[in-house]
């Protein structure tokens, strides 16, 4: 048996096409979705990520606003910029590119973003809402993973899913989304003593641990669907290349479907950032309309 390779690029293109259609509908109603991206410093990887996000936004018809601050900027300067963007009704989404310089508190900066404009889904109000099953802006990578799983598996109800990793960005929200889809969910991490044995029972494995090729075929139940969130740069025969947390070639003979690295989850993350931006624009427009109607009713 050779696993089906899940094409994240093609899936992301379909999501972005839908986003583009939604943007056109909003623009016809006088609403122009706008995404503000804040980049502090000039980290090379962050530069690439920001460039890709802005390019995808422009392709989808979303107005992008890039705000650059020097690496030596103070926490207060970052917070002041966030406050300015929070107050700007023409800005629907705010993305703070991570990591921040070491002298800054990431959590404090993320908490300063208006939850309704928090298109990364990192604000505690959105995190709490997700855990309660409320309709909130959810983290982009787990949302993209869920889309790939639903396209691949259909109904996920009753499936046993194992999430490897418990980060706030991927592991925890991934587990919450799988629970919402009525999966039985197990989270394993660096302190788990039986991680491999638990993975061997899983219908779905989501790897987000940040260790290159950590999981090979011996970890997998035959026929498991494998989502590899890991992005690790390694030296291979004198060349630098990207690999995931899954030993891809080794796992192909056991899994029924698997995402590659690159070309799997990565494109979905950016696609769902655009989707969140459009969702935020729509929700803000509805809120403003409701507020205007309420004012009219009270004064007319």
Swiss-Prot record:
According to its UniProt record, the EC number is 1.5.1.5, 3.5.4.9
Molecular-function annotations in GO? methenyltetrahydrofolate cyclohydrolase activity; methylenetetrahydrofolate dehydrogenase (NADP+) activity
Q: Which reaction does it catalyse?
A: (6R)-5,10-methylene-5,6,7,8-tetrahydrofolate + NADP(+) = (6R)-5,10-methenyltetrahydrofolate + NADPH; (6R)-5,10-methenyltetrahydrofolate + H2O = (6R)-10-formyltetrahydrofolate + H(+)
Keyword Zinc present in the record's keywords: the answer is: no
GO BP annotations of the record are: L-histidine biosynthetic process; methionine biosynthetic process; purine nucleotide biosynthetic process; tetrahydrofolate interconversion
Q: Name one GO cellular component term.
A: cytosol
Listed A to Z, the keywords are: Amino-acid biosynthesis, Histidine biosynthesis, Hydrolase, Methionine biosynthesis, Multifunctional enzyme, NADP, One-carbon metabolism, Oxidoreductase, Purine biosynthesis
Q: Does the keyword Hydrolase apply?
A: yes
Pathway in which this enzyme or protein is active: One-carbon metabolism; tetrahydrofolate interconversion
Family matches, as InterPro entries: Aminoacid_DH-like_N_sf, NAD(P)-bd_dom_sf, THF_DH/CycHdrlase, THF_DH/CycHdrlase_cat_dom, THF_DH/CycHdrlase_CS, THF_DH/CycHdrlase_NAD-bd_dom
Residues that bind NADP(+), according to the entry? 165-167, 190, 231
Q: Which domain of life is it from?
A: Bacteria
According to its UniProt record, which protein family does this protein belong to? Belongs to the tetrahydrofolate dehydrogenase/cyclohydrolase family.
Task performed by this protein: Catalyzes the oxidation of 5,10-methylenetetrahydrofolate to 5,10-methenyltetrahydrofolate and then the hydrolysis of 5,10-methenyltetrahydrofolate to 10-formyltetrahydrofolate.
Per UniProt, subunit arrangement is: Homodimer.
This chain's protein is named Bifunctional protein FolD 2
């Amino acid at each position: 048996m050779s696993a089906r390779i899940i094409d994240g690029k093609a899936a992301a293109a379909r999501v972005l096409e839908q986003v583009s259609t939604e943007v056109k509908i909003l623009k016809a109603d006088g609403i122009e979705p706008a995404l503000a991206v804040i980049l502090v410093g000039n980290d090379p990887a962050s530069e690439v990520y920001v460039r890709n996000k802005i390019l995808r936004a422009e392709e989808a018809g979303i107005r992008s606003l890039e705000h650059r601050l020097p690496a030596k900027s103070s926490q207060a300067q970052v917070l002041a910029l966030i406050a300015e963007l929070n107050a700007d009704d023409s800005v629907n989404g705010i993305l703070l590119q991570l990591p921040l310089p070491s002298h800054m508190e990431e959590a404090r900066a993320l908490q300063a973003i208006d939850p309704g404009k928090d298109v990364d889904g990192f604000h505690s109000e959105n995190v709490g809402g997700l855990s309660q099953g409320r309709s909130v802006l959810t983290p982009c990578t787990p949302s993209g993973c869920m889309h790939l799983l639903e396209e691949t598996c259909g109904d996920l109800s009753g499936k046993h899913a194992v999430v490897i990793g418990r980060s706030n960005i991927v592991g925890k929200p991934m587990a919450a989304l799988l629970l919402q889809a009525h999966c039985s969910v197990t989270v394993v991490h660096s302190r788990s003593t039986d991680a491999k044995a638990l993975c061997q029972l899983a219908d779905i494995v989501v790897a987000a641990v940040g260790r290159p090729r950590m999981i090979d075929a011996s970890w997998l139940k035959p026929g498991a669907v494998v989502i590899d969130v890991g992005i690790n740069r390694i030296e291979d025969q004198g060349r630098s290349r990207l690999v995931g947390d899954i030993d891809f070639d080794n796992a192909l003979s056991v899994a029924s479907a698997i995402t590659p690295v690159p070309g799997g989850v990565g494109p979905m993350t950016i696609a769902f950032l655009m989707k969140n931006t459009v969702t935020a624009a729509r929700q803000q427009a509805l809120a403003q309309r409701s507020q205007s109607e309420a004012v009219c009713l009270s004064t007319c």
